[in-house]
């Protein structure tokens, strides 16, 4: 019997080895609403990027919206646009390895190629500025033979404040 979980409904075990089928059925009933709420949680987390400029010309939310808008206007598919939107969602939680956060969120839903691009966009962007901060701008070359290297190296949407020469309807602020 499947039903919505109640707040009081809990598994009885304290160690996973002691879980029963009923315990796991209870946990499963709690998991479904959690999984179904992912989009709302990601959008709420994106809003945390508002006002966080990090020294850039626009805040991180505006940058994310601009990036997704450019991808949409370029005719990219829905998965690509979503990846463009969430590519920096991890900035607040994990600034050093933020690309891995967005990539982990979308991994079950997008192609291996899009997941790879999202997971590696940070090291590829490093090409444009790492030499200014004492890092190896060519670190991305470790992936030169990877089939998605060229797709990730593309500069189409990588600027903190992307400017579209074609008269985009990009938001200038969030």
Model-derived features: positions:
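Acidic/His-rich, divalent-metal-binding segments that scaffold phosphate/diphosphate chemistry
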Residues: 1-94
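Divalent metal-dependent catalytic cores for phosphoryl transfer on phosphate-bearing substrates
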Residues: 62, 68-156
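Conserved small/polar residues in nucleotide/adenosyl-binding loops
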Residues: 157-164
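Hydrophobic alpha-helical segments, chiefly the membrane-spanning helices
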Residues: 170-173
């Amino acid at each position: 019997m499947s039903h919505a979980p109640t707040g009081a409904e809990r598994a009885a075990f304290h160690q996973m080895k002691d879980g029963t089928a009923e315990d796991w059925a209870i946990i499963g009933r709690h998991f479904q609403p959690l999984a179904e709420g992912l989009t709302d949680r990601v959008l709420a987390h994106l809003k945390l990027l508002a006002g966080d400029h990090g020294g850039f010309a626009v805040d991180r939310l505006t940058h994310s919206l601009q990036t997704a808008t450019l991808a949409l206007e370029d005719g990219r598919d829905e998965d690509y646009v979503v990846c463009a939107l969430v590519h920096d969602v991890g900035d607040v939680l994990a600034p050093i390895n933020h690309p891995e956060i967005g990539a982990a969120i979308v991994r079950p839903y997008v192609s291996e190629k899009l997941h790879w691009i999202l997971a590696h966009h940070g090291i590829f962007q490093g090409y444009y500025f790492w030499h200014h901060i004492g890092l190896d701008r060519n670190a991305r070359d470790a992936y030169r033979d990877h089939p998605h290297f060229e797709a990730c190296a593309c500069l189409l949407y990588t600027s903190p404040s992307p400017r579209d020469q074609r008269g985009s309807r990009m938001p200038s602020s969030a």
